[in-house]
Amino acid sequence: MPGPECKWSTTETGAPCGTDDSSGRLAPVFVYGTLKTGQPNHRVLLDGAHGRAAFRGRAHTLEPYPLVIAGEHNIPRLLNLPGRGHRVFGEVYEVDERMLRFLDEFESCPDMYQRTRLHVALEGVRGPLECFVYTTATYPPEWVHLPYLDDYDSQGKHGLRYNPRENR
């Protein structure tokens, strides 16, 4: 059974599960892990049954964050510790409310990830862009000491193979 339904966040900090917004607007979402192009879960962004997701470009966080691979399934996690780690590379998608709700459920928000906001530099665009992102705020203390990545690849030289959901 899925956790509580997350809705559009309206606070400056992007507190998870804010108020609903049915305005039909598109929300920018920064993805840094298995949802990126060429990664194991990218297909869910392409599936129109979940809503609309339009690729806007490559980007990187303006602040450094610790991006680690953690847990028994080698899941990439962006720890919500701005100022530590590296500027993280990823992609920005503009998503409709239906896709955002799907992503909240897919990312087990708010139990496993929390939908927050951060600023990114989008390639070819001047000025920062505020995006939603799925970060991890609650985790075992040893995760802070794992190696920090700046650009996740499930087949990367780190040797930690992601275990897809369908194999768990």
From Swiss-Prot:
It is an enzyme of class 4 (lyase). It catalyses: epsilon-(gamma-L-glutamyl)-L-lysine = 5-oxo-L-proline + L-lysine. InterPro entries: AIG2-like_dom, GGACT, GGCT-like, GGCT-like_sf. GO terms for cellular component: cytosol. The keyword Ribosomal protein does not apply. Residues 1-20 are annotated as: Disordered. PANTHER family: GAMMA-GLUTAMYLAMINECYCLOTRANSFERASE, TROPONIN C-AKIN-1 PROTEIN. It comes from Bos taurus. Belongs to the gamma-glutamylcyclotransferase family. One of its GO terms (biological process) is modified amino acid catabolic process. Monomer. Contributes to degradation of proteins cross-linked by transglutaminases by degrading the cross-link between a lysine and a glutamic acid residue. Catalyzes the formation of 5-oxo-L-proline from L-gamma-glutamyl-L-epsilon-lysine. Inactive with L-gamma-glutamyl-alpha-amino acid substrates such as L-gamma-glutamyl-L-alpha-cysteine and L-gamma-glutamyl-L-alpha-alanine. Keywords: Lyase. Signal peptide: none annotated. It comes from the Eukaryota. The active site is at residue 107. This is Gamma-glutamylaminecyclotransferase. GO terms for molecular function: gamma-glutamylaminecyclotransferase activity. Substrate binds at residues 32-35.
